[in-house]
């Protein structure tokens, strides 16, 4: 007894809680020490003990045991507070929807996680024996996350698509859920239930496919004799120790391992836990192990390459079906991957980035040159550091150094005061190369209806040149300017023109009479005019019949509805993505329109011209034809425009053919009549017959000219041409043959006609050979066009009005629109323009400045009493000078809006500048902006005039009284010429900048004299009474605001509201017309401006703002719709593309594995293995040349892709806590990667190109033939691999049975019944386990015959040849390999183990 006591005392007393994992470890240790039988006895005792204790405990569970965590209240409140701030930022347009979604998810995820951690400590302190607590951490059933849902908060749910719902469930199941929360949680739960069902079936199918790929892999030898291995290093910190141990245990060493001179392990020794520990303690060299990858054969595996059997811990037995075990070990946990979907479903894993916190209070300092300002993924401003950044924090003489790793975000500014534990930097979550990321698109929809507006340049995506998909080049705002369109009950026509003002009453009147069609015309007019439009009633009311347009005081134009659509002053045709605007000026008060001269100005939709682009074109009526025909230039030189300097950028509009620049003085047009008939039409004339005028061709068409008929049948239609002209029968066929299809100039004699006469005109000779009749020649008349060189600016525009100044340059170029000999088809009655005269815009610059490549054009319409004028402004302003100094220099800080967003439209001059600085800036700007304004207006009725102004005749006003501008006053002011005073009319966004409301306006008075005065506050008021002034809005349309009426623009009911300023001298916020103002930006002394919008009118004491909503869009987002398009509520505005990491996403477990095994690349950016494989292939072949390149390239590629595939699959399983031994995955990956694809070149006599063959087989064939096979590696998915095996019976029993069997029959394939499945299908004994020996003997008998033949022939080449062709036959080396001594047999075996 005493002895027993002393033994007890020597034992280790283990006072620890044993949970599931500890239990697993204990059992494995027990098996190692005592073996199976003894362990089972011990475990029986443990079981009995457990049941006794559980009976004594008698745990019960009541609702009172669910204790809510006390800190939950303030945690939730805090999260709500953060969400509220976020919502505000989103509303102001500082953060866009994706950033908002990300951040709100992370806020709630963090709250939920914190609560979960609190839960455990809370229970431990308040009630350690709480049954809920005991159960949840017992490891038996249920886990912390479920208890968390009972007593913490349910947290975030995913919707059925796996996307997060950003409304968290704040209650837990103990408190009960509200109705909304209940519905959201049903979403999640339903998803869970459905998932479980669906994914169980998925996992089952995955298992089936996996087993299909590897069912034939059986352990058939002890050693394949390979010398290769995969190296694993314990010193490399990449692999955690746990994974390192898992990788090594049960493997076999491929090489001896030395520790200094001493050998601590030898080749072919299997690795146990003792050996692994020794490796770790000794920090040994890299360890080379044998894996299924290194085994020499593809269709079986040897004991040493497989290693220990997982069941009993010894080397695997011969005849073990390791393939099927591997398939099932990967497929079966698939069901577990699915069962864990819905506890924390779909949380962004990127959510928990590491933070760097300040060690103490103090001022932070770092080198600003090493950081780069950027936006974090939440939309916060931050600095990105590219290299290790050392940050110092000074506090009371103590200096702390903090090191921030590269690619981190720094969240504080230089010299900022930070508090202790404040987050100063965020380290990006480790970016693995194999981090699964997917691209997600998020559409943002409009909340209100209105007009679309961009605040920066947006460019077309190149692939959608003509579509409405635009990409954003930088972060900017999109604005929806509010306003609803009027919808009418019947055909909408409006009496008002664009930008007219009208009172609300008149709008309703218009609606009333339009919806009541029985009202007569007279009543309409009467009612319309008597309804007191703007308080004054004047003008004769003519009868409706005689009026074409009613002339009414100043602002109202009444247009007869019938002609409304034809003569609106700017008839803009949309052609793909340009506006083509024919100019017709309408002189009010005249009945007839001016004849349009045909000059059309063409402006790209985004308003940007590049150099040498076409500004306007003029279709000369002399070059119009009404009939179809062919153009010929004869032999005269004409070349397509490709020369660099002649290159005109012209996006081919659909109906324009490629242009040919004319170096031609004349060209010819050969008319012909063409009828295009449907293929089914019955034609009443024969081919090659001659008909007269007005002959019936088909039932309802008649010919317009007489001549020869040619009928051509195209695919679905018939082309019938009638050539007019004389027919000549030449005497000698060979002589005339050179005249076929040529032009003959006048003055040539006709030789073959009886009387010789000179030709008056050009003719075209065309030979025609009918089938039976005599050969004849058709002589056709030709229309000759001379191209006048005289067309230049002077002929288009009168010389006295044409002034080219400074740097702008217009050039006239003629283009023939059709190529030489190209047939031209006129459609029904339209006329065909043969030559187009284009105005090409170009500009020069001083050599010093950087060249401006593009210019902005915009249109304005100015309307004064009785006359409408259109301006086209083109300016070369590159960009406004924005002046920002270093951040710590307070004297020159740029303007930053209060809420931290960056405004693109606010002029960067701000009151912090000293005055001299501004004047200096203004002078600089004057030198820089070389602007040009062209005015098109009709001075007299006959011609259009074009005035070219340039920066020399425009001058800029500064807002200061001490700056004197003399040049403006001296300038002679022409009557009738409104010159805009500023030339910084930008792209359509910023029209005219008005500083402080009074520095200058664009003033046009009634008597057409341009008045320019600079008003200070005092004398502005008296001039205000006498002047009617006009303002430009953001579209460059000038109109007259009337401050006393209630303003409504048709067709928008705009939400205007007035904002009164109490102006003082100090108020110097710069408000410019067309500027966008965000919410809560302070523009006046009396508090913040409350709504966001666009400034439409700036008046002495108030500003009119059209309310607008900003949407932030970041770089690379896609904008839908065009600038100025009217959007309705719910239309798509923007599409964001953002990356979301998928790796740890629990919902993504099984599909991810399947995606990797099937080698699909669904939306996965960082991991597209197939592309990598191709890349590796190409590089290596390029470096090493052909034969070696293919051999080594394939080897390396396969090795690379195998390792990465194994890592990817393991990563998914480990993230779920499922442990699978690498060797199972390796067996399957080996099958996916063991095939190569034969290329086109070389080896055509053995393999056909595109054939899939095993890599080993390709190498051996190459060695036997001593010539290179060109092949490249290919990754097959498991389904394709199952359909590309050596056994057609196995393939047919998997998928596509009929196809596989038919092919096998045609090719005469032989199935050697190697695998398990073939034998099962045919009812034979399967070649594993006990059936394995039988197979060996059978294969011996099989192979006797060829062996005997081979010993007679000593020709090695023939023998190798035959081995390759009969490569299916294999010998299996069981333990009886000692019998084989004969060399020929040995060589045969060596070749036959594929």
From Swiss-Prot:
One of its GO terms (molecular function) is DNA binding. It is found in: Plastid, Chloroplast. Its main location: plastid. InterPro entries: DNA-dir_RpoC2_beta_pp, RNA_pol_beta''_euk, RNA_pol_Rpb1_3_sf, RNA_pol_Rpb1_4, RNA_pol_Rpb1_5, Rpb1_funnel_sf. GO terms for cellular component: chloroplast; DNA-directed RNA polymerase complex; mitochondrion. GO terms for biological process: DNA-templated transcription. The keyword Zinc applies. Keywords: Chloroplast, DNA-directed RNA polymerase, Metal-binding, Nucleotidyltransferase, Plastid, Transcription, Transferase, Zinc. Its cofactor is Zn(2+). Zn(2+) binds at residues 224, 295, 302, 305. Its EC number is 2.7.7.6. The keyword Transport does not apply. It is an enzyme of class 2 (transferase). Belongs to the RNA polymerase beta' chain family. RpoC2 subfamily. HAMAP family: RNApol_bact_RpoC2. DNA-dependent RNA polymerase catalyzes the transcription of DNA into RNA using the four ribonucleoside triphosphates as substrates. In plastids the minimal PEP RNA polymerase catalytic core is composed of four subunits: alpha, beta, beta', and beta''. When a (nuclear-encoded) sigma factor is associated with the core the holoenzyme is formed, which can initiate transcription. This is DNA-directed RNA polymerase subunit beta''. It comes from Vitis vinifera.
């Amino acid at each position: 007894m005493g002895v027993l006591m002393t033994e007890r005392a020597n034992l280790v007393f283990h006072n620890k809680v044993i949970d599931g994992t500890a239990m697993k470890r204990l059992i494995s240790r027990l098996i190692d020490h005592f073996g199976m039988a003894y362990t089972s006895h011990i475990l029986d005792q443990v079981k009995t003990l457990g049941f006794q204790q559980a009976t004594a405990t008698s745990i019960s569970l009541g609702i009172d045991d669910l204790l809510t965590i006390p800190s939950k209240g303030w945690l939730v409140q805090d999260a709500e507070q953060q969400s509220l701030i976020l919502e505000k930022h989103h509303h102001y347009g500082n953060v866009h929807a994706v950033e908002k979604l990300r951040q709100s998810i992370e806020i709630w995820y963090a709250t939920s996680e914190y609560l979960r951690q609190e839960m455990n400590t809370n229970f431990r302190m308040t009630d350690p024996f709480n049954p809920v607590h005991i159960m949840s951490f017992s490891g038996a059933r249920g886990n912390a996350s479920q208890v968390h849902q009972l007593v913490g908060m349910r947290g975030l749910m995913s919707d059925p698509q796996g996307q997060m719902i950003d409304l968290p469930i704040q209650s837990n199941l103990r408190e009960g859920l509200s109705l909304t929360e209940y519905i959201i949680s049903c979403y999640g739960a339903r998803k869970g239930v459905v998932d479980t069902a669906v994914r169980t079936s998925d996992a089952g199918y995955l298992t089936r496919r996996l087993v299909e790929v590897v069912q034939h892999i059986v352990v058939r030898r002890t050693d394949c004799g390979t010398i290769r291995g995969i190296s694993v290093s314990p010193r490399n910190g990449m692999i955690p120790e746990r994974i390192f141990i898992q990788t090594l245990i049960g493997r076999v060493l491929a090489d001896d391992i030395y520790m200094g001179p001493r050998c601590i392990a030898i080749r072919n020794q299997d690795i146990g836990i003792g050996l692994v520990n020794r490796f770790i303690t000794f920090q040994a060299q890299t360890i080379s192990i044998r894996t299924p990858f290194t085994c020499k054969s593809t269709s079986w595996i040897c004991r040493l390459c497989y290693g220990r059997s997982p069941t009993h811990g010894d080397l695997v037995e011969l005849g073990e079906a390791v393939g099927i075990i591997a398939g099932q070990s990967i497929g079966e946990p698939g069901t577990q991957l699915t069962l864990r979907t819905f506890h924390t479903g779909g949380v962004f894993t990127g959510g928990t980035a590491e933070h760097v916190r300040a060690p103490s209070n103090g001022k932070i300092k770092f080198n600003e040159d090493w950081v780069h300002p950027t936006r974090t993924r939440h939309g916060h401003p931050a600095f990105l550091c590219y290299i290790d950044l050392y940050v110092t924090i000074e506090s009371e003489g103590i200096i702390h150094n903090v090191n921030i790793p590269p690619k981190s975000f720094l969240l504080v500014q230089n010299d900022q005061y930070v508090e202790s534990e404040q987050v100063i930097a965020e380290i990006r979550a480790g970016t693995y190369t194999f981090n699964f990321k997917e691209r997600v698109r998020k559409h943002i929809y409009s909340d209100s209806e209105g007009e679309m507006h961009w605040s920066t340049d947006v460019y077309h995506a190149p692939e959608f040149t003509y579509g409405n998909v635009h990409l954003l080049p930088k972060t900017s705002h999109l604005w929806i300017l509010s306003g609803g369109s009027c919808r009418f009950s019947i055909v909408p026509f409006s009496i008002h023109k664009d930008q007219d003002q009208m009172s609300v009453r008149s709008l309703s009147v218009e609606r009333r009479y339009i919806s009541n069609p029985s009202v007569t015309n007279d009543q309409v007019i009467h009612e319309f005019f008597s309804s007191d439009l703007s308080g004054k009633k004047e003008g004769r009311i003519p009868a409706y019949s005689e009026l074409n347009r009613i002339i009414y005081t100043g602002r109202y134009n009444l247009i007869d509805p019938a002609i409304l659509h034809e003569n609106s002053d700017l008839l803009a045709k949309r052609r793909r993505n340009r506006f083509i605007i024919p100019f017709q000026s309408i002189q009010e008060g005249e009945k007839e329109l001016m004849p349009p001269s045909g000059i059309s100005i063409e402006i790209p939709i985004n308003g940007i011209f590049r150099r040498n682009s076409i500004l306007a074109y003029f279709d000369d009526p002399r070059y119009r034809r009404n009939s179809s025909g062919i153009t010929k230039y004869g032999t005269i030189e004409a070349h397509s425009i490709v020369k660099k300097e002649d290159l005109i950028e012209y996006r081919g509009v659909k109906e324009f053919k490629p242009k040919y620049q004319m170096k031609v003085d004349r060209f010819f047009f050969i008319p012909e009549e063409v009828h295009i008939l449907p293929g089914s039409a019955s034609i009443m004339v024969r081919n090659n017959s001659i008909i007269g005028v007005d002959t019936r061709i088909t039932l309802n068409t008649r010919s317009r000219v007489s001549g020869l008929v040619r009928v051509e049948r195209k695919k679905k239609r018939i082309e019938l041409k009638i050539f007019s002209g004389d027919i000549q029968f030449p005497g000698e066929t060979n002589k005339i043959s050179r005249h076929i299809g040529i032009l003959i100039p006048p003055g040539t004699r006709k030789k073959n006609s009886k009387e010789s006469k000179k030709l008056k005109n050009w003719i075209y000779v065309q030979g025609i050979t009918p089938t039976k009749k005599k050969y004849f020649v058709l002589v056709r008349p030709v229309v000759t066009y001379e191209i006048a060189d005289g067309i230049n600016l002077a002929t288009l525009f009168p010389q006295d009005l044409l002034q080219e100044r400074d740097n702008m340059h217009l050039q006239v170029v003629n283009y023939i629109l059709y190529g030489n000999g190209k047939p031209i088809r006129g459609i029904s009655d339209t006329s065909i323009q043969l030559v187009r005269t284009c105005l090409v815009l170009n500009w020069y610059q001083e050599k010093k400045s950087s060249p401006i490549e593009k210019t902005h054009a915009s249109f304005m319409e100015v309307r004064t009493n009785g006359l409408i004028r259109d301006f086209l402004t083109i300016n070369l302003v590159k960009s406004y000078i924005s002046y920002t100094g270093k951040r710590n220099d307070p004297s020159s800080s740029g303007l930053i809006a209060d809420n931290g967003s960056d405004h693109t439209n606010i002029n960067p001059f701000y009151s912090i500048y000293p005055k001299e600085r501004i004047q200096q800036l203004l002078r600089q700007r004057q030198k820089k902006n070389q602007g040009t304004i062209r005015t098109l207006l009709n001075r007299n009725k006959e011609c259009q005039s074009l005035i070219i102004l340039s920066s020399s005749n425009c001058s800029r006003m500064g807002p200061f009284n001490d700056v004197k501008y003399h040049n403006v006053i001296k300038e002679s002011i022409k009557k009738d010429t409104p010159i805009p005073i500023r030339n910084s009319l930008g792209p359509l966004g910023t029209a005219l900048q008005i500083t402080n409301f009074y520095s200058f306006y664009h003033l046009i008075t009634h008597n057409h004299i341009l008045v320019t005065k600079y008003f200070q506050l005092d004398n502005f008021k008296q001039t205000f009474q006498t002047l009617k002034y006009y303002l430009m809005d953001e579209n460059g349309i000038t109109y007259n605001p009337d401050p006393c009426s209630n303003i409504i623009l048709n067709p928008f009911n705009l939400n205007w509201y007035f904002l009164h300023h109490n102006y003082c001298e100090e108020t110097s916020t710069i408000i410019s017309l067309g500027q966008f103002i965000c919410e809560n930006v302070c523009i006046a002394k009396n508090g913040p401006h409350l709504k966001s919008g666009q400034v439409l009118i700036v008046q002495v004491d108030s500003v009119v703002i059209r309310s607008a909503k900003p949407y932030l869009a970041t770089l690379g987002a896609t904008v839908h719709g065009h600038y100025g398009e009217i959007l309705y509520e719910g239309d798509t505005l923007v599409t964001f593309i953002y990356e979301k990491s998928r790796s740890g996403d629990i919902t993504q477990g099984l599909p991810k594995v399947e995606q990797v095994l099937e080698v699909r690349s669904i939306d996965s950016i960082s991991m597209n293995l197939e592309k990598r494989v191709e890349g590796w292939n190409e590089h290596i072949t390029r470096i090493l040349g052909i034969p070696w390149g293919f051999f080594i390239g394939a080897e390396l590629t396969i090795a690379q892709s195998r390792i990465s595939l194994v890592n990817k699959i393991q990563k998914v399983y480990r993230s779920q806590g499922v442990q699978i031994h690498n060797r199972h995955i390796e067996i399957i990956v080996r099958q996916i990667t063991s095939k190569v694809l034969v290329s086109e070149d070389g080896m055509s006599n053995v393999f056909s190109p595109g054939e899939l063959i095993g890599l080993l087989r390709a190498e051996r064939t190459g060695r036997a033939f001593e010539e290179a096979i060109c092949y490249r590696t290919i990754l097959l998915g498991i389904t394709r691999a199952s359909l590309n095996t050596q056994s057609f019976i196995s393939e047919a029993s998997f998928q596509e049975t009929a196809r596989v069997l038919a092919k096998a029959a045609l090719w005469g394939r032989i199935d050697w019944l190697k695998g398990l499945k073939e034998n099962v299908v045919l009812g034979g004994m399967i070649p594993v386990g006990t059936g394995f020996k039988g197979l060996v003997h059978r294969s011996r008998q099989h192979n006797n015959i060829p062996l005997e033949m081979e010993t007679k022939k000593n020709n090695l080449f023939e023998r190798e040849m035959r081995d390759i062709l009969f490569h299916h036959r294999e010998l299996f080396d069981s333990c009886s390999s000692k019998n084989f001594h004969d060399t020929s047999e040995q060589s045969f075996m060596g070749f036959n183990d594929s």
